[in-house]
Amino acid sequence: MDGIIHIGGTMPRIGTTTVGLQLVLFLQSMGYEAAYIEMNRQDYIWGCENLYMDCKQDKLPGKVSIHGVDMYAREWMPELISGGTHYDYLLCDYGNTHRPDFDRKGFTDCGAMVIVAGVKPNEIFATERALRNPVFKEAAYVFSFVSGEDQGEIRNMMRDKARETAFMPYAPDPFDGNPFRKGENTDCFMEIMNYVVRTGGDRDGQVQTDSDG
């Protein structure tokens, strides 16, 4: 399933959707076609449709564009992949990975997995639980709300997953892609995509920067 990235969080409200949307915007800034797929039932797209004035219903069935991000509900995923897609990447947001109805089998059927985690007192045990879960053995980890001075300690805590660990920059607006266009806040997402390439989740085998031409 090349080009398909599945994102899940260790618990609710950990920042999973923000990471997914920011990753879409980062890939767009790199010249790739990317879309966000809501694979959970939190009705985020519905909320955006009723909140943002620039929400556009596309002629393509199921497609909603909000602040330049193409978004689809989970029902459209089979159609997006059955006959091929013009998107280079599909970012699939599975939400909380520890809810009772979480689709473990579906989550692993992809090019790469990303787990969004945290280190606050109410988050660290959920993070450790995810690390012990064999379902997420091949996943990369993105930590939200971690200060720069604490990142080294977190990498040490991650041990053999340190290479697959990244830290989400401050992003109060998940639809704000301006930092990427300025070349800012890119480290986290370059680390994620380097992992995607290593695990075979990239459609053409590489992530090119502007300097690569």
Where are these regions (language model features)?
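Short, aromatic/basic amphipathic alpha-helical patches
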Residues: 47-58, 129-132, 151-162
